[in-house]
Amino acid sequence: MKKYFAELVGTMVLTLLGCGTAVSLNCGADTASVVGTAVAFGLAVVAMAYTIGGISGCHINPAITLGCLLTKRISGKDAAMYMIFQVIGAIIGAAILFAFTSSDCAFAGGTTTGANSCGNHGIAAGFIAETVLTAIFVLVVLGSTDAKKGAGAFAGLAIGLSLILIHLVGIHYTGTSVNPARSIGAALFEQGQALSDLWVFIVAPFAGAAIAAGIWKAIGEE
């Protein structure tokens, strides 16, 4: 049970700090806001990786959990429980943020929670972006955490840095999710376009995770 609760706490922190930074920076499209938001999400992952990594592996993302399930690093039961607790954690994090913010966030369709949406770029562009970026992110996770070929103690740093890069690329198009839990939590409070576009930020990251698992099986497993 401890590992499930660790996933809840980790996802809550990621959602609160990452989305909270986006809202604090008015979810702007200017360089400073984009970079600041990207760095916040990356640092939140690094912090949690070294805090709860030894307890749960610090997935804090259903897409990562799916990638681990498809590469047989986690059981079906644990994967399901991880995802449930991740979503609960994200909802709690978004609720806390929603409770103390009243910022007007016009970028990517969000207002008070840093929620994701496809904005003016359209569903197709958003779906492609989230699928490709999630595939890259999950591939980094699978490779850097591999028991034999991974980066060992540096895995958390590699994962956090890759998330920064992915946000730098994707924020302009979708606000960058690559994490269904984070998107669900924010969208529930955001409503509007964020809620109507939510399916993209669930289906696309899962598709990307499946692609990443397939790639890793092809290049990383013996």
Positions of PLM-derived features:
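Membrane-interface helix-loop junctions and terminal tails of multi-pass membrane proteins
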Residues: M1-E222
